[in-house]
Amino acid sequence: MSSPTTPVPVISWTADEAIKFLKEWNFSLGIIVLFITIILQFGYTSRSMFVYVVKMVILWFMWPLTIILTIFNCVYALNNVYLGFSIVFTIVAIIMWVVYFVNSIRLFIRTGSWWSFNPETNNLMCIDMKGRMYVRPIIEDYHTLTATIIRGHLYIQGIKLGTGYSLSDLPAYVTVAKVTHLCTYKRGFLDRIGDTSGFAVYVKSKVGNYRLPSTHKGSGMDTALLRNNI
């Protein structure tokens, strides 16, 4: 004779319990929300690279956290309707997570930079300064890029890259790497402001399916020698 089935307990909150929880955790939740808000508000490469990296870490952990929560909802679904939606959300989250990794790996093959795994954008700006390749993420697909030298400090699109440079060190070409292609920007204008400052404007001139040169030797002109089709 089979034993009687034990009913599954239903967990529910009363209004008083919810208010008590908020009172007990209100301070901690407020600090966490404030921290995330500050990171999202001021996390830009042109403001603070450290804050931007923290922002990227938070965004990076959002997808696995979302997948965990959707799987939890599937296991502990309240009814069949919730179960159906939870399964759909889980599949969508996993597919988007896999697509992110595939695109990031393809971009890494093209550039060789760990910025390829940036969850915010798939646009990586690449500039060769005296044999050193700088790679930084940019949010938008710009038609022009501006490189600025201020008393030896190099900025491009407002992002500080390095020091000890002059206008003569600026390359003839700058590239922006994407998942499917590489955009080449040609220097169209250069103006000197004082003895140690000035700026150059680069205009998008060519788009192709290339990767960055594997060697960083030589001048910035080497960036134009796009090879190794992928």
Swiss-Prot record:
It is a multi-pass membrane protein. The chain crosses the membrane at residues 25-45, 56-76, 85-105. The keyword Transport does not apply. Residues 46-55, 106-228 are intravirion. It comes from the Viruses. GO terms for molecular function: structural constituent of virion. GO terms for cellular component: host cell Golgi membrane; membrane; viral envelope; virion membrane. Residues 1-24, 77-84 are virion surface. Keywords: Glycoprotein, Host Golgi apparatus, Host membrane, Host-virus interaction, Membrane, Transmembrane, Transmembrane helix, Viral envelope protein, Viral immunoevasion, Viral matrix protein, Virion. Its main location: virion. It is found in: Virion membrane; Host Golgi apparatus membrane. Homomultimer. Interacts with envelope E protein in the budding compartment of the host cell, which is located between endoplasmic reticulum and the Golgi complex. Forms a complex with HE and S proteins. Interacts with nucleocapsid N protein. This interaction probably participates in RNA packaging into the virus. Belongs to the betacoronaviruses M protein family. Component of the viral envelope that plays a central role in virus morphogenesis and assembly via its interactions with other viral proteins. HAMAP family: BETA_CORONA_M. This is Membrane protein. The lineage of its organism: Viruses, Riboviria, Orthornavirae, Pisuviricota, Pisoniviricetes.
